[in-house]
Every structure is written in structure tokens, then in C-alpha cells.
């Protein structure tokens, strides 16, 4: 599968990623809590590395669903304020929240095993 042979927005549907923006971020992600770990995928249109994640996510969607994350997504090329909020130096970036607290972030797509390990560590610290 080449980097351009798929619709990059398919991953949003596949993982039930809810769109967020700078105006509604706190209400949706931070205050929309519970015990479920929230993962915000910050990306940019035509970002090669973002598309690598999207492609990998489509190939490994079952494994990513098994992580029991509530997914959100935002194009920070379009929503510059949200990118500034997290002082992004690159995308993709994944930011994690639980019960209103920011727990950490991953910059870049490290690959499925490393992503799974990072999520497992955050979930174990609950």
C-alpha cells in the first residue's frame, strides 16, 4: 500500500475518532472524562508522517481498538491555535488525558509495539 493509495480520513471512521478544535477541546477531551484514556491525534493535511500513521492504523485497527482508547483528532495545520497550545514541533503528535489530567504525549509515530507499550504504561498508572 503506497502512501497515497488510500483515503487518509478512513482512519477517523475506523477508530471512531471524534473531531475537536481549539474552541471545544476542553469540553470534549479534558472535561469529557471518566476512566477511559483519551488519545488526541494531532495531525496535518498532506503530512507524510501523519499519513504513515493513518496507513498503519488502518492495517492494525483491531490492535488499536483493543487499547480501549477514546480517540479524538484535529488538523493543527487548520487549527493553528491548537498546535500552539501544545507547542508542537512536529506532527503527528498523540496527547493523552484521563479524568481531566494530561498524562503525556508521543511525538511522531513510533510504530505499533512502542505505541502499545506507552499506552499500557499510562493505563497501568491509573
Model region roles, listed by residue range:
Residues 90, 95-126:
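Non-catalytic, surface beta->alpha helical segment in thiol-disulfide oxidoreductase systems
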Residues 17-22, 42-44, 61, 66-81:
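Thiol-based oxidoreductase modules, predominantly thioredoxin-like and allied folds used
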Residues 1-36, 118-126:
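N-terminal leader/targeting and pre-domain segments
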Residues 32-46:
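Short active-site neighborhood of thiol/selenol oxidoreductases, capturing the structured segment around
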Residues 49-65:
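Typically the conserved alpha-helix immediately C-terminal to a functionally engaged Cys/Sec
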Residues 85-89:
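A short glycine-leucine-enriched loop at secondary-structure breakpoints
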Residues 47-50, 94:
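The canonical Cys-X-X-Cys-His
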Amino acid at each position: 500500500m503506497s502512501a497515497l493509495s488510500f483515503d487518509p480520513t478512513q482512519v477517523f471512521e475506523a477508530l471512531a475518532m471524534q473531531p475537536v478544535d481549539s474552541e471545544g477541546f476542553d469540553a470534549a477531551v479534558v472535561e469529557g472524562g471518566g476512566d477511559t484514556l483519551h488519545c488526541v491525534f494531532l495531525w496535518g493535511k498532506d503530512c507524510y508522517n501523519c499519513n504513515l500513521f493513518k496507513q498503519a492504523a488502518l492495517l492494525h485497527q483491531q490492535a488499536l481498538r483493543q487499547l480501549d482508547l477514546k480517540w479524538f483528532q484535529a488538523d493543527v495545520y487548520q487549527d493553528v491555535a491548537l498546535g500552539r497550545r501544545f507547542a508542537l514541533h512536529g506532527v503527528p503528535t498523540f496527547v493523552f488525558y484521563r479524568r481531566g489530567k494530561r498524562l503525556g504525549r508521543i511525538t511522531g509515530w513510533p510504530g505499533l509495539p512502542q505505541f502499545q507499550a506507552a499506552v499500557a504504561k499510562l493505563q497501568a498508572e491509573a
